Design a protein with these regions (language model features):
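Charged (often Lys/Glu-rich) extended helix/loop segments that serve as interaction or gating elements
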Residues: 140, 149-273
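Glycine-rich beta-alpha junction loops
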Residues: 36-40, 85-89, 119-123, 158-160, ...
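Short, glycine/charged-enriched secondary-structure capping and boundary segments
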Residues: 26-29, 47-50, 95-96, 130-132, ...
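Conserved beta-strand positions
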Residues: 14, 83, 117-119, 154-156, ...
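General structural feature for long, well-ordered alpha-helical segments within catalytic domains
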Residues: 1, 19-22, 60-63, 67, ...
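Short glycine-/acidic-enriched loop or helix-start segments at secondary-structure transitions
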Residues: 23-24, 43-44, 126-127, 163-164, ...
Length: 273
């Protein structure tokens, strides 16, 4: 994969000292980015935190001197530094903190022209929740950057795509057990695995009952043979019936691309308008 990327002229980011040790000839006299673990992990769930000792990503700062020396010995230049703290972060100050951590190691890499601060810009998932403040992040980064002559890169990812998509599914059955009211829909974790995988919250709306009083508390589940096939827990919705159309919001990112045919269930069809 490294060879194919280099042959295609792809800008290569290395996040493991082992690769440089194992294949020095491959990286000889190259211009490279390094992905660093700045030990500043944040995220909406522990499974999406991508920095710190519990994350597999990035070169630990304790190995950075060895990496720099090895690259110098094979005539390679580090022209960019990259880090990604995690996903679903609403606090703009996280990126300022990350930039300041970059600046602590920057004197050791005089050829660096780019600082890539990664992605993870959060998307509001509940009604009334404040969104990510891009203007504040801009102010914080410019203030921290000062007169430093480098490019700042960001990878907005889900921030751009999440709100552009929804999941639609019909109610197939209803069931009550004690105080729990189950609302079954025609698809589940095979189409949207985020709730089951890391407890992601998605707003759910009964499009067939718009304007009706939301006086029923439902657990919304799919048809997959897993107790974890839950789309939403404890949601107040109008009393629903078989055939009602349910909308699950913010599925434009990490929805269809993470779907599967698990349990031989076809995932929801994707329509692009």
């Amino acid at each position: 994969e490294y060879e194919a990327a280099l042959a295609a002229g792809v800008r290569l980011t290395v996040d493991n000292y082992w690769a440089i040790q194992a294949w020095p000839d491959l990286f000889e006299r190259r211009e490279l980015f390094l992905r660093l673990d700045l030990d500043t992990g944040y995220g909406h769930h522990r499974k999406v935190i991508t920095s710190g000792v519990d994350s597999k990503f990035g070169i630990s700062l304790e190995h950075l001197a060895d990496v720099r020396a090895r690259l110098q010995s094979i005539g390679s230049r580090v022209v960019g530094l990259h880090a990604h703290t995690g996903s679903g972060v609403i606090n703009a100050d996280v990126w300022r903190e990350q930039l300041e951590r970059f600046m602590e190691v920057l004197p050791d890499f005089p050829d660096v022209r780019v600082l890539d601060l990664g992605g993870g810009l959060g998307v509001p998932d509940r009604r009334g929740q404040a969104g990510f403040d891009l203007e504040l992040m801009d102010e914080l980064l410019l203030d921290a950057l000062g007169d430093l002559d480098v490019e700042l890169w960001l990878e907005p990812g889900r921030y751009l795509a999440a709100e552009s998509g929804v999941l639609l599914s019909r109610v197939t059955q209803l069931k009550s057990k004690g105080q729990c009211n189950y609302l079954g829909i025609a698809t589940g974790m095979n189409s949207l695995i985020r709730p089951a995988l890391y407890g992601a919250y998605h707003e759910v709306v009964n499009l067939s009952r718009l304007g009706s009083s939301a006086d029923m508390n439902y657990r919304i589940v799919g048809p997959i043979c897993e107790s974890g096939d839950v789309i939403a827990e404890s949601r107040m919705l109008p009393a629903s019936k078989e055939g009602d159309i349910m909308l699950v919001a913010n599925t434009g990112a990490y929805g269809r691309v993470m779907s599967s045919h698990y349990n031989r269930r076809r995932p929801a069809e994707e329509l692009v308008l």
